[in-house]
Curated annotation (Swiss-Prot):
It comes from Synechocystis sp. (strain ATCC 27184 / PCC 6803 / Kazusa). The lineage of its organism: Bacteria, Bacillati, Cyanobacteriota, Cyanophyceae, Synechococcales. Residues 187-206 bind DNA. One of its GO terms (cellular component) is protein-DNA complex. This is Response regulator Rre1. One of its GO terms (biological process) is regulation of DNA-templated transcription. Residues 6-123 form the Response regulatory domain. Disruption phenotype: Loss or reduction of expression of about 30 genes in response to hyperosmotic (0.5 M sorbitol) or salt (0.5 M NaCl) stress. Most of these genes encode known heat-shock proteins. GO terms for molecular function: phosphorelay response regulator activity; transcription cis-regulatory region binding. Pfam families: GerE, Response_reg.
Amino acid sequence: MAEPISLLLVDDEPGVRESVQAFLEDSGDFKVDLAANATEAWDYLQHHLPALVISDIMMPQVDGYQFLQKLREDARFQSLPVVFLTARGMTGDRIQGYQTGCDAFLSKPFDPDELEAIVRNLLARQQASSDAGSESAKLQEIYQEIRALKEQIGQPSGIHTTPSPIKLDFTPREQSVLDLVSQGLMNKEIAAQLKTSVRNVEKYVSRLFTKTGTNSRTELVRFALQHGLTE
C-alpha cells in the first residue's frame, strides 16, 4: 500500500481543523497535519515538506496572505500548492490571493467533497509537471550524449568506423527511423516527420534494438556511427 500523501492544514478554528482532517484522512490517501496559526505552520515547514498546504486567510497575528507571501519568497516553497479557505469571498480578496500566489480558493462554508477534488486536481497537476520536467531533462541528456558521440567520429582517441560484426538488413523505414534517432529526435518528432504513429515508431526502434543487440538509444546511435550505418 502506498504511503498517504502529506498535507498541512492551517486554521485557527479547532472545529474546521478537526472536521477537514477527519474527512480527508477517511479515504486513506492523505495524512493531514495541523497548525493553529501561520507561526505554527512556518515552524512545521522547517522540518517537514507536505505535498500541499490548505490555509485559512483570516488568522490572528499573521494572516493567510502574509503567510503565503513568506512561502513564495522562500525557494523551498515556491512551487508548493496552496489552497485558501476563506469567509471572504469578494473578488478583490480572490485577486489578492492569486497575485500573492495561491492556487485555489474555497469559500466557507464549503463542501468537503469539493475541497478533496481541488486537492486531488492540484496534486495531479503537480505530478504531471514534475514528470514533464524529468522527461525533458532526460531527453536533453540523450541529445547531448548523441551529439558527443558524433563529435568523436574521426577523432584520434574517439570512435572509428569499422564494418558491422553482424549482417544487418534494415528495411527502408527502419533506416529512416535510425537516421532520425541519430539526429537526436524522439519518437513523437520522428512520427511527425515520417507521418506515422508514435506506436509504429516505437516498434521500429524496438526492432533496431533487437537487430543491433543494443538496449538504449545512446547505445544504438553509438553502434550505428561506429559501423557506418548512419551519418
